Amino acid sequence: LKLRSAADKKILHAEYVAETVRQMVFAQYGQETYTRGLNVYTTVQASEQMAAYKALRQGIMDFERRQIYRGPEKFIDLPADPKKMEDAIDDVLDEHPDNGDVLSAVVLEASPRKVVVVRQNSEQISITGDGLKPAQSGLSDKTPPAKQIRKGALVRITQTPKGAWEITQLPEVEGAFIAITPQTGAIRALVGGFDFAKNKFNHVTQAWRQPGSSFKPFIYSAALEKGFTPATVVNDAPLFFDSGVTGGQPWEP
């Protein structure tokens, strides 16, 4: 007999999907949403949802690595007494919980070549080499105290695909991901932001932005439908229509 705990189950990060569904149902049923025992079925696919979640976070974190290091999130005094130090570390880590694979840690020692951090349960991790590059500006003697990585600093760390550790930071930028079946309009995956617990604003359904170049495929497809090909030559010389053509003011688009 094998007992399977809740911890054995994989977490499906579909928080933005669930909140979007809740809002839609609430708009129709009001407070009865929470008492009618409704079952809601979506077209979201678990495997595709997780792939979208990981892809969005990876893309944002890759962007974050190219940004200047903004400094530790907090600084604490580390008592000399080991038990008091452990309690102080546990308290600050509880106040700043892990964000997915972006983990919180407290610095025990720091130099331009090596940083030693500690996690809960006194787990120590040494970070060297490329793992220090994203935060190199925070390890200089000339760095302002508020941005310097030093003993007692609360920092973020993450593990690279190769298994090495590196210092990172929670991103300030946001992003969104939606995958739709064009034939039916079914939503296969939806991620409204980097972290639902941090920011519940859904950048898929609530953000209003200029479409930019994303509109170009519609123009290209309309041109292809009318017989244009990649080899078609289009005369893009300036146009000018005088008053005789317009019947009023000259017009130059």
Where are these regions (language model features)?
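Beta-lactamase-like hydrolase cores
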Residues: 63, 67-71, 93-102, 141-148, ...
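A short, well-structured edge-of-sheet supersecondary motif
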Residues: 103-119, 168-197
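Active-site SXXK
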Residues: 52, 184-185, 203-234
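Non-catalytic, structured segments within soluble enzyme domains
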Residues: 1-119, 253
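Glycine-rich, acidic and aromatic/proline-enriched surface loops and short helix-turn segments
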Residues: 17, 22-23, 179-194, 224-228, ...
